[in-house]
Design a protein with these regions (language model features):
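Short internal beta-strands
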Residues: 46-53, 235-239, 372-375, 394-403
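Phosphate-binding loop of NTP-binding sites
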Residues: 4, 39-42, 79-81, 90-239, ...
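Nucleotide phosphate-binding/pyrophosphate-handling subdomain across enzymes
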Residues: 15-23, 34-43, 288-395, 413
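Short beta-strand "acidic-cap" motif of Rossmann-like dinucleotide-binding folds
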Residues: 47-51, 158, 180, 257, ...
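Beta-strand->loop->alpha-helix junctions that form or flank phosphate-binding loops
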Residues: 51, 72-75, 110-115, 159, ...
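C-terminal helical cap/extension that packs against the catalytic core
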Residues: 59, 63, 68, 385-439, ...
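N-terminal leader/targeting and accessory segments in enzymes
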Residues: 2-111, 115, 410, 473
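Residue-level signal for inorganic ion chemistry
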Residues: 40, 86, 128, 161, ...
């Protein structure tokens, strides 16, 4: 029986039985909002969806909405406060006046993740979080579990922050499904009860501080991924991350450590490590040695260690893991080749929305000062100074764009030349005008995309389109 846990408002955790006769409010008509509204409507709930954007901006999205769902657009009216519970979109601040009033009125607010999982029948949940690497790791782990599920006659889904809402995958009809979920701090902070069989925290460095308000609050959000596990569950942690080591004392489940350090093999507590370019796993009293996926950088070796170790904990066989590794393709927008123009190699790393991600990308760049670095977007409140050593070692010049440009220039112009561009298209043109064959142009923004783009995917695709346009122009000339 599930424990009686509470949410901010003091209400019980979400259970379909308890809330069945209460009207559901869904705040936001994004992917997760539409998906959870449809899920609830399909389960017989009365659903009211409220969206602050105008009808013109969300009309296409609403076409996918169940016809029984009531809607309002262009703002939130008092009708939202007549509902029995609410489901909010990820990223909506708890300082939002509507959320504050909901809590004051005693109306519980849940995440799409928690509500969706409440309808899943006996799922095997593997949940992945971390500041960086969670998309690659989730996709890798999801591919392993698809192969494993096929041998068990079960279904497998990869969902969450990768763009596939949990609610869209959960139909409640598949018993014993394997669900691999990438969960952001936004999603976790609103989940009062999730209990993965396997939880994964890859690393924790400053990010989303403008949303959470402090590093402490950000860490507390991440910890929710394991807080409700028990001794029969597993928690996979990065032994080289100091915050992971510190929080391990709060983990109620069995901890499995992975490490990329040179002496990891000598430490008996380490369950997965790298030796001679191979991945070594120690689990269940056995030792397995696998070839890593064909991906650049030590960070991807770490991602593979985490994915493989998690899969073993979930019952996958070494051969299944190896098959997934052998066939794994790079994640879009993460150190992704975008094209070559005038001998300059352009790299799309639009998913790098924080400084630590940029550090990972820079480590994968060629030696010597051959890299042009495009930074900028909406500032997230973390310093850019940690970039200085690698910038001085590898970066020829920085091109800044977006709202954060003045802040970036203030912190980094003393160690490398900085030029400001009106947008990323102009940034590409500046590099083509000043660079030379053999250089690399790395688009790794270190900022969110919301100043000019829908999301990092939109930003990355626009960047690739610009590079293609410039390459096509070169061929025509």
């Amino acid at each position: 029986m599930k424990p009686e846990l509470t949410y901010r408002s003091g209400e019980k955790m979400f259970t379909p039985e308890y809330f069945k006769n209460k009207k559901a409010l869904v705040i936001g008509a994004g992917k997760s909002g539409i998906a959870v509204a449809n899920l609830l409507a399909g389960k017989g709930f009365r659903v009211f969806l409220s969206e602050s954007a105008s009808l013109d901006k969300v009309r296409d999205r609403l076409k996918d909405l169940d016809s029984s769902v009531e809607t309002e657009t262009g703002g939130h009216t008092d009708a939202v406060f007549s509902c029995g519970f609410a489901v909010k979109c990820p990223g909506l601040s708890h300082k939002n006046p509507v959320l504050i009033r909901l809590e004051q009125n005693g109306i519980p607010v849940f995440s799409e993740v928690e509500v969706a999982l409440a309808f899943a029948r006996s799922p095997h949940l593997l949940a992945v979080t971390g500041t960086n690497g969670k998309t690659t790791t989730s996709m890798m782990l999801g591919e392993i579990m698809k192969i494993h599920a096929a041998t068990c006659g079960a279904a497998a889904f990869t969902v969450g922050n990768i763009g596939n809402p949990v609610a869209a995958a959960v139909c409640g009809e598949d018993t014993g499904s394997f669900i691999t979920a990438e969960l952001s701090s936004y999603q976790l902070e609103d989940s009062s009860f999730i209990k993965p069989e396997v939880s994964v925290i890859l690393n924790i460095t400053p990010d989303h501080l403008e949303h959470h308000g402090s590093m402490e609050a950000y860490i507390e959000a991440k910890k929710r991924i394991f807080l409700f596990q028990n001794k029969n569950c597993f928690c996979v942690l990065n032994h080289e991350d100091p915050i992971c080591r510190k929080m391990s004392s709060d983990v109620p489940s069995e901890i499995l450590w992975f490490s990329s350090s040179d002496n990891a093999e000598e430490r008996c507590e380490i369950n997965a490590f790298i030796k001679n370019g191979l991945l070594v796993f120690r689990h269940g009293g056995k030792k397995f040695i696998l070839n890593p996926p064909d991906l650049p950088g030590i960070h991807n070796m770490e991602n593979a260690l985490a994915a493989g170790l998690s899969a073993l904990a979930a019952g996958a066989m070494p051969g299944e893991i190896q098959r997934a590794f052998d066939n794994f393709k790079p994640v879009e927008h993460r150190i992704e080749p975008a094209g070559i123009v005038k001998g300059i190699k352009f790299i799309n790393d639009s998913k790098a929305t924080n400084v630590d991600s940029v550090l990972v990308a820079l480590k994968a760049m060629p030696a010597g000062k051959k890299t042009w670095l495009i930074l900028g977007g909406r500032d997230k409140g973390a310093p850019y100074s940690p970039l200085v050593p690698l910038v001085m070692e590898k970066v020829k010049s920085i091109i800044t764009t977006g709202e954060a440009a003045p802040v970036i220039e203030k912190e980094l112009s003393s160690c490398v030349s900085c030029k400001r561009a009106a947008d990323i298209y102009e940034a590409c043109r500046i590099i083509l005008a000043s660079g030379k064959a053999g250089d690399t142009a790395l688009f790794s923004p270190a900022c969110s995309s919301f100043d000019c783009f829908k999301d990092y995917e939109d930003r990355g695709r626009r960047f690739k389109a610009y590079v293609k346009e410039l390459a096509d122009g070169e061929r025509q000339n």
